[in-house]
Amino acid sequence: MASPALISETEAWKDLKAHLEGIKMTHLRELMGDTERCQSMMVEFDNIFLDYSRQQASPDTISKLYKLADAAHLKQKIDRMYNGDHINTTENRSVLHVALRAPRNSAICSDGKNVVPDVWNVLDKIKDFSDSVRNGSWIGATGKELKDVIAVGIGGSFLGPLFVHTALQTDPEASKNARGRELRFLANVDPIDVARNISGLNPETTLVVVVSKTFTTAETMLNARTLREWISSALGPSAVAKHMVAVSTNLPLVEKFGIDPNNAFAFWDWVGGRYSVCSAVGVLPLSLQYGFAVVEKFLQGAHSIDQHFSSAPFEKNIPVLLGLLSVWNVSFLGYPARAILPYSQALEKLAPHIQQVSMESNGKGVSIDGLPLPFESGEIDFGEPGTNGQHSFYQLIHQGRVIPCDFIGVVKSQQPVYLKGEVVNNHDELMSNFFAQPDALAYGKTPEELKKENVSEHLIPHKTFTGNRPSISILLPTLDAYRIGQLLAIYEHRVAVQGFVWGINSFDQWGVELGKSLATQVRKQLHGSRVKGEPVEEGFNFSTKTLLTRYLQATSDVPADPSTLLPNI
């Protein structure tokens, strides 16, 4: 008998649907009172502790989710990914970001070829180059050392490396290695982003890393040309060869741009942009800032989770458990969003990165076979570090919409502070909130409890907390390069699990194409209006035509053929 075309047609899915009503009638106060249940919902791997006991789920729910995973052939799909099968069917590609952090002696194949030697050839090249820049043997056009790096990219070429960079900035080992150096990221085509990036920098001491697989990405290449002009106008056109390098596979365009092809660092079609932080996309700028040895520890951390994900049984597999629980929350309980709440300021860029990884991967409306999905998939990801978020959007999380939360805590602070006379130290104060918030969400506060506290009758409705709001807690022992790599890989694989169960392609992103193609028409119109004085053509709808006309009229002072003007800040 053939497998159902959609996961929602399986008996396992229908069984969970039938199970749902009983769970909805059971409050987390009751579920949390079952110690045996709570113990069964705690998992540890390599000193990473996951507690999912505050999920609206019973042991029976979890058992049924394992059956759903079996019905979705989850294990086989994970194996196919690791085996290099073309699981990205719409682009006919392997999905092998796990190969980017595999040990040198590993064998991971795509189209019958072991790709690990190619990965390590690039890593070795990055190590040699970053060492030469850091030790001063590679110098700029005027003989000065290159202490500042601007990485130019967008999307996955920006968000992932920025997350890791921000997390490493306050790690003692990494910050020591980065002393006297600066790493910045230029992503937005808005000239303000250019101005902010070059502010205070000297072209003589700046190295630019241009990240574009095809070397045709519109925003990235415009920003790259802008920085090329910034360098050339200060140091002369020949300086580009010493002050700009590329992460790309299109060597002819790299050379045409003015960058020596020998200073181009490759990555491959089997690396998706949002999964590329462990490739030259992230490893090159991060190695220039922190040294290759630190970045190698980051890769080793990611690899440890890759091994765990591929080999651990589902009941002890952290990414699998997190992925299945997300499917439960989204497709069955109907919660459309997820809050990522790291109680570590060093992780302030985690949520924006996972927002892309998750929403670009699983923001799909059809199955991998092109069938419309009759259920909700994907979720809206957002977040902010604690305790800042508590003074921002936690009001809604506690008393408004139900939003499942990921609480991420770190046992040992990167930068501990102890003040004499304080009741607790700064990190203990932070962690007091980390431990309290999940219980506040789960238990809430009843009108009866408020009456016992002699709260005024008219305030009781306003001070009541319904509770029964699900969360998970992840406790990391430290936050160093290794643990940052582990955290990244946990979320990457969690997203893949969700897509595998929903039966969608988590590794393409056709949704970004339509807006880009329409922008081409607008770009052509702006050029025609600026240079030739052409009116806005009839090809636009009334609204867009009105907005475009208004914009052009208000910027009529923009010269048709301007001389070069760079930001002055």
UniProtKB/Swiss-Prot annotation:
Q: Where is the signal peptide?
A: none
Q: Does the keyword Isomerase apply?
A: yes
Primary location group: cytoplasm
GO CC term (a single one): cytosol
Query: In its keyword annotation, does this UniProt entry include Isomerase?
Result: yes
Active site at which residues? E360, H391, K516
- Any one GO MF annotation of this record: carbohydrate derivative binding
**What pathway or pathways are given for this protein in its record?**
Carbohydrate degradation; glycolysis; D-glyceraldehyde 3-phosphate and glycerone phosphate from D-glucose: step 2/4
> What's its catalytic activity?
alpha-D-glucose 6-phosphate = beta-D-fructose 6-phosphate
What EC class does the entry list?
isomerase
Protein's cellular compartments: Cytoplasm
Reported EC number(s) for this entry are 5.3.1.9
Coiled coil region boundaries:
none
What the entry lists under Pfam families is as follows: PGI (PF00342)
Record keywords: Cytoplasm, Gluconeogenesis, Glycolysis, Isomerase
GO biological process terms, alphabetically, are: gluconeogenesis; glucose 6-phosphate metabolic process; glycolytic process
Give the family, as the similarity comment puts it. Answer: Belongs to the GPI family.
Q: Which NCBIfam families match?
A: PRK00179.1 (NF001211)
The record's HAMAP family line, in alphabetical order, gives: G6P_isomerase
* Subunit annotation: Homodimer.
Q: What is this protein called?
A: Glucose-6-phosphate isomerase, cytosolic 1A
Q: Which organism is the protein's source?
A: Clarkia lewisii
GN (gene name): PGIC1-A
